[in-house]
Amino acid sequence: MTTDEGAKSSRENPAATVAEQGEDVTSKKDRGVLKIVKRVGHGEETPMIGDKVYVHYNGKLSNGKKFDSSHDRNEPFVFSIGKGQVIKAWDIGVSTMKKGEICHLLCKPEYAYGATGSLPKIPSNATLFFEVELLNFKGEDLLEDGGIIRRTKRRGEGYSNPNEGARVQIHLEGRCGGRVFDCRDVAFTVGEGEDHDIPIGIDKALEKMQREEQCILHLGPRYGFGEAGKPKFGIEPNAELIYEVTLKSFEKAKESWEMDTKEKLEQAAIVKEEGTVYFKGGKYVQAVIQYGKIVSWLEMEYGLSEKESKASESFLLAAFLNLAMCYLKLREYAKAVECCDKALGLDSANEKGLYRRGEAQLLMNEFESAKGDFEKVLEVNPQNKAARLQIVVCQKKAKEHNERDRRIYANMFKKFAEQDAKEEANKAVSKKTSEGVTNEKLTVSHAVEEEKPEGHV
């Protein structure tokens, strides 16, 4: 067969070409998924477990009959690698691709739809051919706020994850700007990583990892070392960090349902103090974790004795008030309002709860609501000078806000009026022009009539 004949054969029956020349990309090397690269991608990275990938594809049966195409829908197909969202062949084949690559995949039934098929388009025990283009891929957004992106290098064992308070043993390597600043084995309690110079993003990620999992974590400043940076490691304020973490082992902390009321109250006293230490150190996210434990343990606790109920209510009130203060510092004002609402549900005349809710609403530009809360503070404590000053601030801000709105609306109405006037002027000019043309036609018509010769048959 000549080169030209081979190229023609490849175009006419690409599935046969992959069957003859394709690379076996399966771990078992059983030729269940064969691949030929048709266009080389760029870069060195390939998708990892959990990555979200964006592809275009054409799918055909081995006889060349098309059964599906993302091009027909005019939008890429999106799925996550290694999550069982697609056939096995795709998890295997796409994970070998580079961004921009186009490849042909030939997939045996056991790596596709097997004996059941996918009727009516795909019969049982069908070998499938795909042309796949990898448009893009990105890591898993763990908290859905862009702050922690995980890329899993090695899948963990089992289905259990560390919880808050679990004792973990990990290996970590931290990088910033291409420089390794930390590399060690360390044991600590989840939620208390800061005590070991470990950023909060690692604590959060560990709660979603399995034993022996190895992953790469991209941490935004909020989940790294934040505005303070980490002089010990030479980390500047608001730096983005990359950690490679291996969870070697862990022992879960007791879940709420495993603790009796007495133990919950004892633990609440401990974590309240830990939260206060974090708060005073400016570590507000870590403080939120500690105060949040109190809420998770006691908010839905029933059947308490009078003494236990009083202690529980006291811990919950303090937790909600402290959480509100943390969220104010973190500029999460809606959450601060929510915590104040819960605190005031326990004590409707709580001065701190009213004041902090007023602060949060003021920062959300809810001036009237904020003013109402500060006025309630004065009803509780007429000597609260800060609340009195805040009322003045609310009035001033509301006035400024109203004046700004008036200016905006005045400018809008002025523009509308100018536009209407311009349209009216254009209509008038158009009408005048039209009348002029009509008069001209009449004049010409009369002139023609006067020039008509008389006496013709």
From Swiss-Prot:
GO terms for MF: peptidyl-prolyl cis-trans isomerase activity
Regulation of activity: Inhibited by both FK506 and rapamycin.
Compositional bias annotation for Basic and acidic residues: 1-11, 447-457
GO biological process: chaperone-mediated protein folding
Record field: catalytic activity: [protein]-peptidylproline (omega=180) = [protein]-peptidylproline (omega=0)
Source taxon at top rank: Eukaryota
More details: The relative resistance of New World monkeys to glucocorticoids is associated with a high level of expression of FKBP5, but is also due to intrinsic differences between the human and the monkey proteins. Human FKBP5 has a much lower effect on glucocorticoid sensitivity.
Record's function text: Immunophilin protein with PPIase and co-chaperone activities. Component of unligated steroid receptors heterocomplexes through interaction with heat-shock protein 90 (HSP90). Plays a role in the intracellular trafficking of heterooligomeric forms of steroid hormone receptors maintaining the complex into the cytoplasm when unliganded. Acts as a regulator of Akt/AKT1 activity by promoting the interaction between Akt/AKT1 and PHLPP1, thereby enhancing dephosphorylation and subsequent activation of Akt/AKT1.
Name of the protein described by the UniProt record: Peptidyl-prolyl cis-trans isomerase FKBP5
Gene encoding the protein: FKBP5
